[in-house]
Swiss-Prot record:
The active site is at Y167. GO terms for biological process: deoxyribonucleotide biosynthetic process. One of its GO terms (molecular function) is ribonucleoside-diphosphate reductase activity, thioredoxin disulfide as acceptor. Belongs to the ribonucleoside diphosphate reductase small chain family. This is Ribonucleoside-diphosphate reductase small chain. Its EC number is 1.17.4.1. InterPro entries: Ferritin-like_SF (IPR009078), Fido (IPR003812), Fido-like_dom_sf (IPR036597), RNR-like (IPR012348), RNR_small (IPR033909), RNR_small_fam (IPR000358). Fe cation 1 binds at D130, E160, H163. The keyword Ribonucleoprotein does not apply. SUPFAM superfamilies: Ferritin-like (SSF47240), Fic-like (SSF140931). PROSITE patterns: FIDO. It comes from Ostreid herpesvirus 1 (isolate France) (OsHV-1).
Length: 579
């Protein structure tokens, strides 16, 4: 390079660009005094905190600054909490081969085209988004050279690669038109798919070597992990209802991973001496949220059975409020009364998704094999009535159903599953009607998950309840198909009777309760499941009558059931739900 004066306006460059020019040209170019001063000032700004331990400065354990290969020695850690994140990620590692995407094809072919279109767009964004993240996180290995940081980032890189392959497997299995698939995956470059393009563009801009703020890049990564995927996870995990098991299981794993990624970068942000101001962090969170809201509006068409736009939008905003809480800044979104906005989606109630257990399989998606326990004091959102309902329902199940809750069972699991089952019932307006799958089998599948092995499945076996040292027998059926036909007959009778009610008369509520009670009592008589019939019936009854309560007096509850069997009178049973 010739020793000529550099021809550019240094005042228009970012500090990062100035520092690069300094390192590249300082010994090869002739600088004017003014140019040298600008470069020198920029360099001082960038290196102001370079002696901080987080950026590789000397510590009591490391007498010298961190060198290029010092991460070969992982101990002692300067920040043990960051090392713990890496250890946790290692212990949670999994492989794409654990997810059989093709097993969902039969269900995929049964859902509506609107639902398929919604899922395709979400999967396409995830495939691109995870690729982008994997490509960009190397930046943080340079910015945070500590061994514990590099260790986590190494694991995250592998982790994101697994995510990328899983989403590609989903797309390959579920989208047979490969030309359309190519267009979908390239949507981030097409203005026609503006919300997807805007998300990818924003992420590419904020997490970039051209960004002159190390702190803003970390906030951008926080937004990526905790906000930019919020609507997508809420959509895909809702498809547990039609039993797309591979789709749900894979996204439970991935959401768990992204939660850990978020917590790592949130902790990194907390430790940074040059952390952006709370106001600037809030600005970036708001930018990311508004882009995610556009995506939520775009990706969910009308007529998608399991998702509504208004609930999804509220969830995205509430999710950002929780991110604010975990970053120790003020919430951003409020309702019309000035209260902090909370998520209406209980199944997405916490960023701590490591607490979740998969809905379908015996394999847990939490990080280790320690006994699963939920901190209900920190449940998000704190729906007090729902938790009270679950407390009462867990209690009545224990005293009425006996062996359904053994002493060895973790009751917190039961309580969480009851909350999830209630949210499932509440998340779609069936207009008072009952559906074999949605209302009955799904509720039992969720409520009894990890309590019995055949949750959600009818059992035509020998069933009885022990009451006062005596056995109460239930009908037996030669085959499950005959049993299912009997239950379907009850459902058809209920739907017919409910539809015939005059909704305009004053006594409609009383008539509705009477019809619902008769259906529930007849269902209890048939006893279609091997266990958990009472729990399931009480959840459905509370939903049908619109009152979140459950009976808690064992003797009176049982008497009301037998009173109906002897007299056909439902009033005593109804009274159990109106105390």
């Amino acid at each position: 390079m010739s020793q000529s004066t550099i021809k550019f306006d240094l005042g228009e460059l970012t500090t990062t660009q100035c520092a690069r020019l300094l390192s590249k040209f300082i010994r090869k170019a002739t600088l004017t005094p003014e140019q040298f001063e600008i470069l020198n000032t920029s360099y001082d700004e960038l290196t102001e905190f370079d002696d901080h331990p987080l950026y590789g400065g000397a510590t009591d354990h490391h007498k010298d600054i961190v060198g290029k290969y010092d991460h070969a020695l992982l101990k002692p850690a300067v920040y043990q909490q960051l090392r713990d994140f890496a250890t946790k990620m290692e212990s949670s590692s999994w492989q794409q081969t654990e997810i059989d995407a093709e097993s969902d094809i039969p269900t995929w072919e049964q859902i509506s085209e609107n639902e398929r279109d919604c899922v395709r767009k979400v999967l396409a964004f995830f495939a691109v988004g995870d690729t982008l993240v994997k490509d960009r996180i190397a930046i943080f290995a340079d910015e945070f050279p500590l061994p514990e940081c590099k260790d986590f980032i190494d694991w995250q890189t592998v982790n994101e690669g697994v995510h990328q392959r899983v989403y590609n497997n989903y797309l390959d299995a579920l989208v047979k038109d490969k030309i359309y698939l190519a267009d979908l995956v390239n949507a981030y470059k097409d203005p026609e798919f503006a919300p997807i393009k805007k998300k990818v563009d924003w992420l590419g801009k904020i997490i970039s070597v051209e960004n002159d703020s190390r702190g803003e890049m970390v906030v951008g990564q926080v937004c990526t992990e905790a906000i930019m995927f919020a609507a997508s996870f809420a959509i895909l995990l809702k498809f547990r209802a039609p039993y797309m098991r591979a789709l749900v299981l894979g996204n439970e794993f991935i959401r768990r991973d992204e939660t850990l990624h978020f917590r790592f970068y949130a902790e990194l942000l907390r430790l940074m001496p040059d952390r952006p101001s709370d106001e600037r962090i809030a600005e970036l969170l708001t930018e990311a949220t508004e882009i995610e809201l556009e995506f939520a509006e775009y990706v969910v068409p009308e007529g998608v059975k399991y998702i509504t736009k208004d609930r999804l939008i509220q969830h995205v905003k509430a999710n950002t409020n929780q991110v604010c809480e975990m970053l120790d800044i003020n919430p951003i979104y409020f309702d019309q009364k000035g209260n902090v906005l909370l998520s209406p989606l209980l199944y997405m109630n916490t960023l701590e998704s490591e607490q979740k257990i998969n809905f379908f399989e015996g394999k847990a998606t939490e990080y280790n094999t320690k006994q699963y326990k939920v901190d209900f004091n920190n449940l998000f959102p704190p729906v007090k009535k729902m938790i009270e309902f679950a407390d009462e329902e867990e209690f009545i199940a224990a005293i009425v159903e006996g062996e359904g809750l053994s002493k060895d069972r973790n009751k917190d699991i039961v309580k969480q599953q009851l909350c999830l089952a209630w949210d499932h019932l509440s998340s779609h307006d069936m207009e008072g009607l009952v559906d074999m799958t949605w209302t009955l089998k799904d509720v039992h599948r969720i409520a009894m998950n990890h309590v019995i092995f055949n949750n959600g499945e009818f059992s035509n076996g020998y069933k009885f309840t022990v009451i006062d040292s005596g056995k109460v027998m239930y009908p037996t059926y030669e085959t499950v198909e005959i049993l299912e036909s009997a239950v379907q007959g009850l459902i058809d009778d209920y739907n017919r009777d409910f539809s015939a009610l005059d909704k305009g008369v004053e006594k409609f509520d009383k008539d509705k309760i009477r019809v619902a009670a008769r259906f529930i009592l007849d269902l209890l008589y048939i006893h279609p499941f091997s266990d958990g019939n009472g729990r399931t019936a009480r959840l459905i009854m509370a939903h049908l009558i619109g009152k979140m309560t459950t009976p808690i007096n064992r003797e009176e509850y049982l008497k009301s059931i037998y009173h109906y069997r002897q007299t056909g009178d439902v009033s005593v049973f109804v009274d159990q739900f109106y105390r």
